[in-house]
């Protein structure tokens, strides 16, 4: 492990574990190795000894204190035996909402090119500016090795209602910002979500690839003060995401789904591009229908 790696892990510890909270480190490869830590020295020791096995992750939200009683307390047992890891019900509370910006590479299990990452960085900046304009407190931005992570500080109880809120919030961001180059991952809404540990490398692809290299995950920017954004700001963005229409007097209690493709064809609307986003499709029209 290099000095730069150690510095990145120490920086992550200061930012994410400043209250001395419990964290789980998980290494996902042929097997899944796991450890629960309150001591950064033990954590670095085990990451250094095991990082060659796969990608290294941390829980973005603190596990309940009881998880510290598991057999992985301050250690990472080896041998590939099955062990308990942090599940949604094991999370004490939500401290961060993750926006995960993935480069669209066209094929699976490869690292991104420099050009693909350039698109992702521009998108990351667009989202960051948008959220700041909407009143959000600044988040922490990480280079995830193959894309970018924005960690938005929050203070949310770990409830089903808040899980639905976070899911709709992320989907609303994806609806607005995902395109053919960059995808905002809508699957990262769960409370026990893990993210790439700064100071560790991507485990994807070939180590010999020059145009798709294995890169280190790094912290890029941290606000002067990490301050939680109030719940109502997340709600306001989440409410932009459309809900599926239910049968009502307004639609004659119809149970049929509106066929947008058929509507476009019947009315001769010119579509220049269709882009898959979140749970739907974005249509880029040749011209505004109201001009």
Could you tell me what each predicted segment is?
Residues 1-146, 153-172, 260, 269:
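Signature for HUH/AEP ssDNA processing cores
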Residues 140-146, 182-189:
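Short, glycine/acidic-rich hinge or "gate" loops at secondary-structure transitions
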